[in-house]
């Protein structure tokens, strides 16, 4: 199935589940300092652009965000700025160049309250489902 153009999606919802994956599932967030940088950049960009982050998780090789904005058209620019900022940081500290993420991020509109609640629960439970932090 082909993706809807982002403009069509943005017309339907102000809430989104966003998934960003490392290129070839590379562990681009493996270290704590990398996760901290991503979360701090996310908070800064969100505040600058009027985006509210309702839930997030940063795993070793991907991140999930649940976001909303009064003007949904700012969400793609928010993600572009966030991922570009992180990619530049990652490449600089790893002394490398090239792509960090697998293409553009994936986004899914959350059209009902039930979808939103289910998605936030999924995001919060993602580390447990992956066996992270279990003894």
Would you name each region that the model predicts?
Residues 1-135:
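Short catalytic/metal-binding and nucleic-acid-binding patches
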């Amino acid at each position: 199935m082909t993706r809807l153009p982002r403009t069509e999606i943005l017309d339907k919802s102000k809430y989104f589940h966003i998934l960003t994956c490392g290129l070839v599932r590379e562990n681009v967030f493996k270290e704590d300092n990398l996760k901290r940088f991503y979360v701090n950049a996310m908070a800064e960009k969100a505040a600058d652009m009027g985006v509210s982050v309702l839930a997030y998780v940063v795993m070793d090789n991907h991140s999930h965000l649940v976001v909303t904005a009064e003007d949904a058209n700012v969400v793609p620019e928010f993600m572009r700025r966030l991922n570009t900022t992180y990619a530049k940081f990652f490449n600089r500290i790893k002394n490398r160049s090239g792509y960090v993420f697998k293409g553009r991020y994936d986004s899914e509109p959350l059209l009902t309250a039930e979808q939103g609640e289910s998605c936030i629960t999924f995001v919060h439970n993602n580390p447990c489902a992956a066996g992270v932090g279990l003894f």
